[in-house]
Structure formats: structure tokens, C-alpha cells
Amino acid sequence: MLDAFTKVVSQADTRGAYISDAEIDALKTMVAAGSKRMDVVNRITGNASTIVANAARALFEEQPQLIAPGGNAYTNRRMAACLRDMEIILRYVTYAVFAGDASVLDDRCLNGLRETYQALGVPGASVSTGVQKMKEAAIAIANDPSGVTRGDCSSLMSELGSYFDRAAAAVG
């Protein structure tokens, strides 16, 4: 796992070069948006249960076969596993937002997840849809302007969305 600062230093070291002006400017922008980044993480963390529950509810309304007898989320144990996995993905998305880097999401959550789901017979397309539903809910909550640092958050919302897209692609 690398945060944005460590990643820049590592890349410069690999090149055998000083940190470039462009890299410094990018890090300055990230620091300037630090309060917004923390607001996003706090909003998502504070509403994690709601985000997961609403995404699961919407998924099961669209794909009722998942919760029907014989479905992959049928029985309380399977449903609990589904919700747990969605919550884990959401948690790692917040880590990526906080760090400003997707490596924690990739390294500790997504690598090998598709293969695990395939081995267990979990429908990756359904998990991917659930992740997209979490994305919609999380962005709506994170983008609510009341009680947070003012300013343009479009870049941060795009970054947040990209982490969900990355997760959806990894499992789909």
C-alpha cells in the first residue's frame, strides 16, 4: 500500500530523479483538498450500513433470483456473507480515498477476489451491480454540501467513483 506521497517518492527514486514540479503541484492540490477528502471518508463511514443495506436492497429488487430458494444470497448465512463482502469493499474504497491511491484497494481487497468468487460460484456480474449501487449511494451522500468543507468536489467525486468502478470491474 502506498499513499500518494510515498508513491511519488518511490517513482522519483526509481527514475533516479528529483521530484518534478508537476508531482509537487499534484501533491499540493491533494493537500489543499485534504479537508474535503476527510469529509468524504467521514460521510461514507458514518453511513456505511445504510449504503450497504440500500445497495443490497436495490440489487435484490432488480435480481430477485439471488434471494429465492437456490439463489446465491438465499439463506441468512449467504445473505450475511454478501453484505459482509459489500461492506469490506466499501471500507477499502474509503481507505483508497483517504490515501489518494488505489493500491490499498487493489492489494488488500481486489486481487484474487474474482477468482475466489468464481471458485465459490458467486455471480460476479451481480456483485459488480451491487458495487455500482454502492457507488451511486456513496457519491450522493459524499456530495451533499451541507455541513462539509465548501468548494468544488467534482475531482474528488470522480476519484471516488473510479475506485468503485475499479472494484466493480475486478469482480465482474
Curated annotation (Swiss-Prot):
Q: Which InterPro entries does this entry report, sorted A to Z?
A: Globin-like_sf (IPR009050), Phycobilisome_asu/bsu (IPR012128), Phycobilisome_asu/bsu_sf (IPR038719), Phycocyanin_b (IPR006247)
Entry annotated with the keyword Nucleotidyltransferase: no
Where N4-methylasparagine occurs, the residues are N72
Q: Which domain of life is it from?
A: Bacteria
Q: Name one GO cellular component term.
A: plasma membrane-derived thylakoid membrane
Q: Where would one find coiled-coil regions in this protein?
A: none
Q: Where along the chain is (2R,3E)-phycocyanobilin 2 bound? A: C153
Question: What triggers or suppresses the expression of this protein?
Answer: Phycocyanin-2 is expressed in red but not in green light (inducible phycocyanin).
**CDD domains the UniProt entry points to:** PC_PEC_beta (cd14768)
Membrane spanning stretches = none
The UniProt record gives the binding positions of (2R,3E)-phycocyanobilin 1 as: C82
What Pfam families does the annotation carry? Phycobilisome
Q: Which Gene3D superfamilies match?
A: Phycocyanins
Q: Which SUPFAM superfamilies match?
A: Globin-like
For this UniProt record, give its keywords in alphabetical order, as a comma-separated list.
Antenna complex, Bile pigment, Chromophore, Electron transport, Membrane, Methylation, Photosynthesis, Phycobilisome, Thylakoid, Transport
Q: How is it modified after translation?
A: Contains two covalently linked bilin chromophores.
Q: What is its main location?
A: membrane
Where does this protein reside within or beyond the cell?
Cellular thylakoid membrane
Gene Ontology biological-process entries? photosynthesis
Classify the protein's membrane topology as the record does.
Peripheral membrane protein
Entry's family note: Belongs to the phycobiliprotein family.
Q: How does it assemble?
A: Heterodimer of an alpha and a beta subunit, which further assembles into trimers and the trimers into hexamers.
The UniProt function text for this chain reads: Light-harvesting photosynthetic bile pigment-protein from the phycobiliprotein complex (phycobilisome, PBS). Phycocyanin is the major phycobiliprotein in the PBS rod.
* Protein's name according to its UniProt entry: C-phycocyanin-2 beta subunit
Tell me what organism the protein belongs to: Microchaete diplosiphon
